[in-house]
Amino acid sequence: PAIGIATLILGSLCLLLPAPMLEGGSRMPLGGFIAAGFWIFGAALLSGEVMVWLSRSLRKVQFGPVLKLALSRLADGSSRHRLAVAGLVVAVGMVTGMLQMVGSFRGTIERWFDVRFQAELYVSERGSGGAAAINGISPQVIEALSSHPGVDYADTLYISYVDAPRGQTVLAGVDFAAWSERIDQSWHTEPGSLTVEPDAQPALVSETFARRFDVLNGGVVELNTPVGLQSVSPVGIYSDYGNEFGAAAVDHAVWREWTQSERPINTSLFLKDGAATNALRDELRLQFPGLDIRNAKELREVALGIFEDTFRVTSALNGIGITVAMAGLVLGLLAIFAESSSTWRTLTQLGFSSRGFVWTAGLEGAGIALSAWISGTLVGLALGWLLIHVINVQSFGWTLVWELPFVAILLFGVVMVLCGLIGGLATGAWWHARQR
């Protein structure tokens, strides 16, 4: 146990390592990756001790002879038992960590989509694939859209890419007052919490921008715009998951002055009470055939569907990992039974039944799986914290809302124990049949 504990401590100390800066301003979470490896290895080493402690604790309870025998074998903590549980711990830890990562990302993205698609209609240039490949929407068209009788307010977004101290970043033009007060935002730091530096333009910056240019607590960043170098200073920081380059949002008028452009990338239309969303959408599509006009709620569902498709592969990877680990458990049990041949022959001579042997094997498998689930869940929770609060933040510059999927983890434990039981029963029956 001393080596396992030392490994866990060493992994924790690795978190103190600075994250190396990469070209473009992003960072590589070197300490986080090393810590994850040490934690998994340390948990695997300690998992055998967990199995022994758990078995010895349960032996104090009065059980039948079959369960007593299974517990005594687990309590002995042979090298093969420890190896079997260690292999499962690695798989369980990775699956538990990924369950947290995917669940936290899903919950965070859903909240962000609620903010991003809070208007009723979303309008962009037809055929545009991104800010770098569009001409933008005509100012006259934007004026016609915002002045429509059914439209209450148009949240128009202007976008350009500018050079910054570390690579490129996004300079956005927004209705500054509306973004600060009227429109819902997911704030990392509320507007007004930071002091704007003298002779700098107040800006609402994304968390990625703030971390990339070290202005989480305020400061100044110089941007190379078409009219020369301009300084921005954050007055508030919002959460955004749309790009990893970061964005600084200034008022429309300032953006137009700095970029010498008049064309926005898109606009979100907030409709008046009682306005029929789809009817107005169809009307505007006929009036402006060059625009892509969509129901924002439907667009949100499409975006969520893309997200789900992207992360569906993680479920398959989790299943593959557990399947391989359970196959390792079965092979480990076969080796354990072969190693215990003399013990089984002695028990048979003493009148121990074939049925009792098979159930002992099944309970051994279940005990190994339970021990692995306990150890793997503990290290998996630590890995989830590491992925969300260290690796993800240093890699992408944004913070996810950490969500613990307790129900999924508990169900996973039940499935693990059942698979261990069934695998043990099947392995025991097959091995015993061969010996006969």
Regions found by a protein language model. Name each.
Residues L30-G37, F105, I109, E283-V324, ...:
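Peri-transmembrane interface segments
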Residues Q140, I159-D199, L204-K297, L304:
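Basic-flanked hydrophobic alpha-helices used for secretion and membrane insertion
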Residues I3-A6, G11, S78-G103, E308-R345, ...:
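Hydrophobic alpha-helical transmembrane segments of multi-pass inner-membrane transport and secretion
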Residues I5-S12, R27-R59:
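Membrane-embedded alpha-helical segments of integral membrane proteins
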Residues S12-I34, T377-V415, L425-Q435:
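Short helix-loop junctions at transmembrane helix boundaries
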Residues W39, S47-L194, E207, N217-G219, ...:
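Juxtamembrane segments of multi-pass membrane proteins
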Residues F63-L71, A75, R82, A296-A303, ...:
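Alpha-helical membrane-protein architecture signal
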